[in-house]
Amino acid sequence: MINRAGLLITFLMGGLTVLLWAVVNQPDVEPPWPTTIQGFCFSPMRATQTPMKGQFPSTAEIDEDLALLAGEAFAVRTYTVESTLGEVAPLAGAHQLNVMLGAWISQNEAENKAEIEKLIKVYRENHDHVVRVIVGNEALLRGDQTVEQMIDHLKRVRADIWAPVSLAEPWHIWLQYPELVKHVDFIAVHILPYWEGIDVEKAVDYVVFRYEQLKTAYPDKRIVIAEVGWPSNGRTRKGAQATLANQAKFLRRFLAVAEREGYIYYIMEAFDQLWKRQLEGEAGTNWGVYNLDREPKFAFTTPVVRMPGWQGLVAISIGLTVLLLAVMFRDSGGLMARGRGFLALVAYAITTFAVWMVWEYSRQYLTPATLAVGIMLFIAALGVIVVLLAEAHELAEAAWMRPWRNPARSIPASDEELPMVSVHVPAYNEPPDMMLQTLDALAVLNYPRFEVLVIDNNTKDAAVWQPVQAHCERLGAKFRFFHVDPLAGFKAGALNFALQQTDPNAEIVAVIDSDYIVKPDWLRDMVPYFSNPEMGIVQGPQDYRDAEQNAFKAMCMAEYRGFFHIGMITRNERNAIIQHGTMTLVRRRVLEEVGGWGEWCITEDAELGLRIFEQGHKATYIPQSYGKGLMPDNFADFKKQRFRWAYGAVLILRHHLAELLGMVPSRLTRGQRYHFIAGWLPWLADGFNLAFNLGALAWTVSMLFWPDSIPPPNILFALLPLSLFVFKLIKMLFLYRRRVAATLRQSLAAGLAGLSLSHTIARAMLTGFITRKIGFFRTPKFASNSALLRSLMDAREELLFLLALSLAIVGLFLVRDDSDMMDIRVWSLVLGVQGIPYLAALLVAFIGGLPKLPARLVGAMN
């Protein structure tokens, strides 16, 4: 249940959230919209219509639109007389609207001739209210016509009509071609600050500046601003943000200036035009003052707010956060106020961002395609959010728990009370000298009753296993050696064989790897925890003794240390530790009741622990080191070891999914289910991240080949993976300093080593979803240190991904003309961040290929 501190923090953070939304949406008082403006750019296409496919509105639909604008404007500007759009002029006259009549000029001269002939005809039939004529819209800007061709068209039209004639082009075209001016009756100029990346706060001044620039250059020509406006949605162009609030601000401010200065202008535009998305992207659809349903998009007279109706959005955000915190605080009795506050901050930030993300995406006109893309992106974003919340929860519990609620407790026992222990040491093709050290350490255990069973399975070379057999005979009756060949089931098969050979009086089974040298008090200190009859497992940490050998092993040591001093501690709070196949003790009765070690799973230790939990038994984790083994000698073995762990995790999830989700009866608690799912989420995220990278590369290649039609992904969705990466980095550095007592160098080394395994884990995750069995891989001991080139070759897949991502980034800046836009830069940053794990793999492989690089460069952790 949520205690009073949790409730107080929830409500306080809720209040701060409301305040934040209120500050962001503080009303801006802007000049009121005039009763009647001078003119609208008029394209009456509806949602399903596009002139690009010859789909035009009916005469009745055009008349409805003109009736809506009557009284709102004095005039409308048209762009073509094609099809029913030639009826705009007569229909406008019926609504007392003047017309600036336009003809569309393209590269097709036959079509241009027909368009001009119809333009002249429409003008002559409606000359009483057609006040100006435009021949061509940005034909020079597009490169469809030359200056000489446009002059010929102007001469042709001016010869047959008596209204003022011009062509419509942006301001720079008029300055670039002064020879045009003497062939027009007025200058029809487009001044659109958004396309030029001008901040909305400077946009009106920019329009005035360009207007005055033209006025100075051509003092004898009247200037008509044929297009001026701001889109309500679209890509951010330098300082120009396309938002509804910015559209309202710009237009209301401009209209006030235009009225004061006496400008002749046409607002771009009356209605949103969905068909323009193909030409101009999302911004092209959103220039209208009215939306597709012919409703005003913003307030004309009242103050402007950034997000109209934000009160409802903040209510949704707070409601979602309260539900989220009710779950996160459900089992957090020992969490300090700082931890609760941190979780509340993260929860409110995430829900606020999620609500804003959905609202922002929904502002666009959703087609079936954009809706499908949005759903896929939202599902991906939801996955990132879940991982981020799980990471935040672990950080809070690791940093701010008081005190630990589930500390291990043992009852001192006399020698007579201590149960017999059977120590099992599985081995396959292990160096005999190393094995002798392991056995010598076991021989001096300070424990009254124990036996040691060494099971060598499937080693072919007798010179490897016979010295171990002889040494067991020398150590006496407590040591028994078994060489079995063939023996199925890998390590689990060997352990099950040992269980069959175990002394009937043994109550506890202890397992260590063949390279571990244990301390004499290992069993004496650990076995008393079984005085609790519910205790099924007592687990110690994995630890290593060769961290000082070189820099590579020092990095590996730092990476291993994090889980055993952070993750296992927090999992122990809810009786949800991961059992490891070394330094572990299991109650024999429990081991036999659950069916022994699972020979189907290559991570038989973790799978056994989960089965024991499913039967309702307890486990405890003792963070003190009682034995040390050997780490992988090179990067290839480091990767293979982690591949096996990650692959086994997927198999366990698949095999036990029904129990973990509560779909079949078991005695798993909610906390255990949470930790087993949430604990493997980061690995699952690595798998999805690989799929994301492949998709990102494919999308970027499409952006390079079809730059005009394939935009970069929405910035909102790009921000989430960036946020997760930064959060995980900060979390790792913070907890390593706080819980592992690592230096900054050691923390960074641990992070680098962990990142270097991301691709390996991703491959293991994806492989685990499509296969059910893969061969067991033992971690070699005293393997040859890889030469540098060989070590780098072990990271060849990562190198290919790094090169692909790097080339994608370079391509964006070399190929795309819009590479200076915010979304391109953000997407490039995403690609760069996605490349960091691959770069980390190359760096770790490089370090692993230099076995003489001293450990002091990292700082060995003892």
Where in the sequence are the language-model features?
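Aromatic-rich peripheral "rim/lid" segments of glycoside hydrolase catalytic domains that contact
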Residues: 31, 47, 51-54, 236-244, ...
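A conserved acidic beta->alpha catalytic loop
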Residues: 448, 456-468, 485-488
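The conserved acidic donor/metal-binding loop of glycosyltransferases
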Residues: 512-517, 600
